[in-house]
Amino acid sequence: MSALSAEPELPGGTGWDEIVRVREETDAPEGSKVEIIEGVVTVSPPPSEEHNDTAELLHERLYDAIPSGCNWGIYQTLGLTCPETGSLFVPDLCVVPRAALRRGTSVHAGEAELVVEVTSRSNANHDRIKKAHGYAVAGVPFYLLLDAWQSGRPTATLYGEPQNGTYRVLASVEYGEELSLPAPFKLVLDTGIFPLS
């Protein structure tokens, strides 16, 4: 992973726009993920096969968990802005009202109903700490972290009740156990389906 520093607060209030411009102009290899994490443009390599498989398996199950009547989509490459922390995240999965994408403007992270990150060895701490903080600051109701690199024991952790930039742990299980997503999703997720890295 490489990082390009950018001043989060430039004179004249152009800080956020300048950071976003640097991100947009970053010439990253195909398949890489270019994000802004706390004012730093970060380029992550393409995810592994196991990483992609995990995201797809969850993606498939989330469709059945979306309440009827909700016009929500499940997205894999949607950029979510969080200028409050100088961040623009591209989560592995997010559930967002479709109307938020149709305005022609960027989507604020706080509009997401659920955000999912699947850790990679190279950037697990971003997912565990910086992104968790950013999503909590934005007010994302639920953050699901699928962490195959957690101290030798793959773990799925559901965070919720964001307050003052932090989440409360609602549930945490080792891969192989079931994890329940509460309303509005009402999904019992068998984490044994996820591949181990």
What are these regions (language model features)?
Residues 1-138, 142-197:
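Gly/Pro/Ser/Thr-rich low-complexity, intrinsically disordered segments predominantly at protein N-termini
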